[in-house]
Amino acid sequence: MFREKAFSQVSSSFVSPLFPKAGETVEISILLSVRPEVVILKYDTDTGLVFGKEMKEEGMENGAYRYSVSVPVTTDGEKFTWYFSYIISGVSRYYSKKGITRYVPSFINRFSLIPGLESPLWVASSTCYQIFPDRFNNGDPNVGAKEGEYEFDGGSVSTPEWTDEPKEWNESRCCDFYNGDLKGISDKVEYLKSLGISAVYLNPIFSSRSVHRYDTVDFNHIDEKLGGDPALASMVKTLHENGIRVILDISINHTGLDAVWLKKAREDENSDEHDFYYFKSDGSVECWQDVRTLPQLRYSSSLLRSYMFRRPDSVMKKFLLPPYSIDAWRLDVSPEVGRRGSDQLCKDVWREVRKEMHSVKKDVYLVGEDWDDSAPYMNGDIWDGTMNYYGSGRILRSWMGQRDRFLSKDCGHSAEREENWTGYEVAGGMKEALDGVSDQNVFFQMNLIDSHDTPRFHNDKAVFDRDIYKGAIMAMYMLPGMPNLYYGDEVGIKGRLGSNEGARFPMEWREEYWDMDMLSFHRAMGKARKEKWLGYASYRIEEVDEKAFAVLRFTDHDAYVALVNRGEKREVKLDLFALPSDRVEIVYGKGEAKTEGKELNVSFEEKESILIKMWK
């Protein structure tokens, strides 16, 4: 419909500064393939009206005309939005996240900033490694669970050999401790660095009865079976000295049955702790999702909020401060917190958590667990990012031919085959997910395919194809945000379908059992992610054809193109508008890539995905 091309985005190349304070002047730019008669930035003002300001031509950039203008951003904490208008041959156009249109873009499609947004800027340039602590590595044989030490939920503590397969829940009752510990994580710091890891996400480590530790007994202390409080302080110190941040998992939604708070509540119905829970008339307690070992916490209690996140010595503040000094909280079942019956306090709780955490650490990262579209929580006042199942994991699994977990039995653990998504569907789904999130928060999403709550994709033999899987992983590494690698995926760790237990096998440390090809691939992706320019680079998700899509990341000087393919041997073309393309190099994959004008011509083998680097 339109002969010209245009591109702008909330990224380091088009908005400066990217995280302004209220009242600060921001330079905003756009690239156009032709020289219009006039280009105008239409932007919010503190009058409540949209003003227009003519943009100045700055010269040519990668074959396009660059126009820029500086404007003051408005009220602290409120969205500052804008779009562009221009005239070619007497005909007006508009440009927004919707692309080029003849109509004025709606508010939801306008570009936006949140002035004064306090953000964890380190996230966008990080690569994360998720660790299930009991199953990663044993570093201190003097700590850990003992065989038959106690009984819990109908089971008794067992200590299998490291090479034993985990039993199903009905046999183990989540009491099978392999005795991985925090020192074991410290001991593997060089291994983590070899993967390009700069952040680790640990599943819960608080004092608990079960191996998954979501049934917290005491939030104020680290489980002695993992080494206790000193082990956390020591581990964080070691990781920080090696450039690795630490994300801890916390479920403020519920405790365990043996929680110190619940014990006091049951002993004395007049106690403060009694108000922390939802007690029924028969004296029993309401539990999250009716899981009898996970009694739900009640956030209409002001004192509970004080203990959990308000007080200087509250749980969530304590571990952000020395001697622990963690960097982030992963927020378990976060859309469900504060919700039961007439209590609908979820957003209120998280807004207060954010305010309180930022009072002690300005760059703390708050990442929610949400399997759906998180747009309502991603407006700068609740979470920084989410475990991005919606915009990465669920889409990439569908691309590889696995039915979406919410359409399959056992929440996806008994995975089912389905017709693969096309390149058009993948690109459409990813773009919709990205456009729904507040523009600055795009860079704080935690992108993933596998986790402790999903079957490991490479263990699903009905759909797994090594070459197609590599392409999906490549896309995960290149999407804006932080890629998250689940421990052991890089070496093809064993596992099974059907339950969470099948995704929580002990880490394989015997190198003769490693998938060296997959390990080499992950190391190559980790190395690519370390490019300093990549964190806040612009992005495009492009449909190539039915069996290919592309993730493009770029600045005015550097670019990566991840061409993800599950089709036959062929040649394809990609539009390189706004990208630097003087020099071209294939970083990973087999094929040929060359530029002709502002097009990239790529030839590749069947099911071969390619990562291409370009620069000027």
Language-model segments: residues:
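Carbohydrate-binding surface patches
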Residues: 542-579, 610
